[in-house]
A protein has these predicted regions:
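Class I S-adenosyl-L-methionine
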Residues: 3, 10, 39-42, 46, ...
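Hydrophobic alpha-helical segments within soluble ligand-binding/sensing domains
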Residues: 1-20, 64, 107-111, 126-146
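Short beta-strand elements in bilobed, periplasmic/extracellular small-molecule ligand-binding domains
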Residues: 21-24, 42-62
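Hinge/cleft segment of the Venus flytrap/periplasmic-binding protein
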Residues: 130-179
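Paired acidic/hydrophobic, glycine-rich loop segments that form the ligand-binding mouth/hinge
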Residues: 78, 122-124
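Glycine-enriched alpha-helix->loop->beta-strand junction motifs that scaffold or abut catalytic
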Residues: 97, 117-121
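Hydrophobic alpha-helical
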Residues: 41, 56-112
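Extracytoplasmic ligand-binding site segments that recognize negatively charged/polar headgroups
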Residues: 3, 23-41
């Protein structure tokens, strides 16, 4: 998912991020998923000249917005989970990110709202159903055999932009977000 976010940022700037800066935010900085997303994103942008100015990992939900507002100005805020995308979106909507563009991973109606209002540029939506199904499948396999090694699997995702938010293809995704 982090790689997908990096690809979208690179597409928007034709691969040229020289002289641009970013901050990365994740609600749970110590989780395995956050680590993979961070590594995937950084692999995608590491040779582009993009400067990482700050990271905000493992913050408390209620204080996330205050921390975001206190960070130095950047060109982009990359949010690696839904809670972070919502916090960054709310700050951007209130003009409290000093013009930073938000690129995030999320699966809530609030994240979609910030995309719709222009507070976020891009939303990568993980297929949570598939992730849950794969997780349960691996758990059952592990119960059947003590020698079974859990495999890491890629979770499918959808990239949504403001202009494609209400497309026919995304209607089902929006419906499941609202449930």
């Amino acid at each position: 998912l982090g790689e997908a976010l990096a690809e979208e940022l690179l597409k928007d700037y034709s691969g040229s991020l020289e002289g641009k800066s970013l901050g990365i935010v994740a609600e749970s900085g110590s989780s395995y998923a956050s680590g993979l997303r961070m590594a995937g994103f950084w692999n995608g942008v590491s040779r582009t000249g993009l400067e990482l100015r700050w990271t905000m990992l493992g913050y408390a939900r209620e204080s996330g917005q205050e921390f975001l507002e206190s960070k130095p100005q950047v060109d982009f805020v990359v949010a690696l989970d839904d809670a972070s995308t919502r916090a960054a979106g709310q700050c951007a909507a209130g003009g409290r990110l000093q013009g930073a563009l938000v690129y995030g991973i999320g699966n809530s109606t609030e994240a979609a709202y910030y995309l719709d209002t222009g507070a976020a540029e891009c939303l990568v939506v993980p297929d949570s159903f598939q992730a849950g199904y794969q997780s349960l499948t691996e758990t059952v396999r592990g119960m059947d055999s003590y020698l079974h090694q859990v495999e890491s699997r890629q979770v499918s995702h959808t990239v949504i932009r403001r202009d494609t938010l209400f497309s026919r293809e995304n209607q089902e995704i929006l419906f499941t977000m609202s449930q």
